[in-house]
Amino acid sequence: MFDAGALWMAAKYEIPMLIVMYNNRAYYNDWNHQIVIANNRGTDPSRAYIGMDLLDPDPDFAGIARAQGWWAEGPIENGDDVQAALRRAIEQVKKGKPALVDTVCRRGKGKAMLT
């Protein structure tokens, strides 16, 4: 989501790679940082979530990747479907294509799991 142009570049120059997305539909890797900054600035840390969620609509990362010339699958919400998707993706990488598998994971803190 940060740079869709990087997806295009990999497709244009035929860079075979596999990206498996840990998609919690949020920028939660930045959550604690936002709280620290809010506290340092004396602002309300309960508002730190603003701009962190990627919901309504949920981005179609597989669709974005396909639009840039990638083979892509997802969003995958059932953990039982991941293994087969990875096999298909690996076959594409072996053919010299970039592949993306979007796995939707549980939101929030704690052990990461598919929903």
Language-model regions, residue ranges each:
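Thiamine diphosphate
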Residues: 1-115
